[in-house]
Design a protein with these regions (language model features):
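N-terminal pre-catalytic "stem/leader" segment of glycosyltransferase-like enzymes
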Residues: 1-46, 52
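Glycosyltransferases and closely related glycan-assembly transferases
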Residues: 9, 17, 66-80
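A nucleotide-sugar donor-handling region in carbohydrate enzymes
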Residues: 91-157
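Structural motif
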Residues: 55-56, 80, 96, 142
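Charged helix-capping and loop-helix junction motifs
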Residues: 157-164
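Short N-terminal targeting/anchoring amphipathic segment
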Residues: 50-61
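Single conserved hydrophobic/aromatic residue that forms the stacking wall/gate
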Residues: 166-175
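Short beta-strand elements of ligand-binding domains
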Residues: 60, 81-86, 98-100
Length: 175
């Protein structure tokens, strides 16, 4: 969902050590219904005007593809545009595309990641390494599982989570 995409954009901006602002650029209601490959790259498709000038645009997900391409076409080499996730439009629309390795996306401007990009840094992890030490036993191995929330493809209700945990724990029980 929206938070996951913002998290990925922030993560990449932090990794690049960029100062950033969030600019929410929405397509108007009519153009939200169309896939990016069928949406015109024109300012009339936007609900709001784009007033800021940017050096780097980092977009993530389907709804941000058109604004990113629009800004790149408008400002050409004055900006760098980076899209996170498989855009399902020509990769030539972007300076860089960051996609998880499992998507199998190939191109001269494609950078692959192991899983999703996130905003946690090594220094933040190091600073907080003792956070859970008083709450967990050090005598046994700890496995951490981070589950995402519901989206239009998956419904993470309690039953699905319970079944997932049972499925994951079965190999452990056998050993």
């Amino acid at each position: 969902g929206m938070h996951g995409m913002i998290s990925q954009v922030e993560g990449l901006a932090k990794a690049l050590d960029l100062e950033f602002i969030h600019e929410k650029i929405e397509l108007n209601s009519f153009w939200k219904l169309f896939p990016p490959r069928l949406t015109p790259i024109q300012d009339f498709v936007f609900k709001n005007k784009i007033n800021n000038k940017f050096d780097i645009v980092i977009s993530c997900g389907r709804k941000s593809i058109i604004p990113s391409i629009y800004l790149k076409k408008k400002f050409k080499s004055k900006i760098i545009n980076i899209h996170i996730q498989e855009p399902k439009v020509s990769l030539d629309n972007f300076d860089f595309v960051v996609a998880p390795e499992h998507d199998g996306l190939k191109g001269s401007n494609v950078l692959t990641s192991k899983g999703a990009v996130h905003y946690l840094t090594n220094s933040e992890l190091d600073e907080n390494e003792n956070y859970l030490k008083s709450r967990i036993s050090t005598e046994k191995k700890i496995v951490t599982l981070i589950l995402g929330g519901p989206n239009r493809y998956y419904d993470y209700n309690n039953q699905v989570i319970d079944l997932s945990l049972i499925h994951i724990s079965e190999p452990t029980r056998r050993s």
